[in-house]
Curated annotation (Swiss-Prot):
Gene3D superfamilies referenced in this protein's UniProt entry, alphabetically: Ribosomal Protein L25, Chain P
Protein's organism: Acinetobacter baylyi (strain ATCC 33305 / BD413 / ADP1)
Any single biological process term in GO: translation
Name of the protein in its database record: Large ribosomal subunit protein bL25
Known partners and oligomeric status: Part of the 50S ribosomal subunit; part of the 5S rRNA/L5/L18/L25 subcomplex. Contacts the 5S rRNA. Binds to the 5S rRNA independently of L5 and L18.
Annotated spans, Disordered: 1-22
Xref: CDD domains: Ribosomal_L25_TL5_CTC
Gene from which this protein is expressed: rplY
Cross-referenced InterPro entries: Rbsml_bL25/Gln-tRNA_synth_N, Ribosomal_bL25/Gln-tRNA_synth, Ribosomal_bL25_short, Ribosomal_L25_dom, Ribosomal_uL5_bac-type
Length: 98
């Protein structure tokens, strides 16, 4: 059983949307969202290299993942993953609180 830990950075409202997401992707960052439970949804960014490394293991899709956002740790499961149609790199990730 592998333990997955991803480091994320919270995004402000000015870093959300189509243009901002494209700028993040050019900087090798993946926009993501954490939602569910009693807490409000949190928009975050994850390093592309870190996410791709975790995706290499099939257990990533089945197990609870720890996402560190600042000093807070969220236990989540991946809900959806959007990939680029030609490059197959992750473009956006949805995480649901476990």
């Amino acid at each position: 059983m592998a333990n997955f830990v991803l480091n994320a950075t919270a995004r402000n409202e000015d870093k959300q949307g189509k243009g901002a997401s494209r700028r993040l992707r050019r900087e090798a960052l993946v926009p993501a969202i954490i939602y569910g439970g009693e807490a409000e949804p949190v928009a975050v960014t994850i390093e592309l290299r870190e996410l791709v490394k975790a995706l290499e293991n099939n257990a990533f899709f089945e197990e609870v993942v720890e996402v560190k956002v600042g000093d807070k740790v969220e236990n989540v499961k991946i809900q959806a993953l959007q990939r680029h149609p030609a490059k197959n790199t992750p473009m956006h990730a949805d995480f649901k609180r476990a």
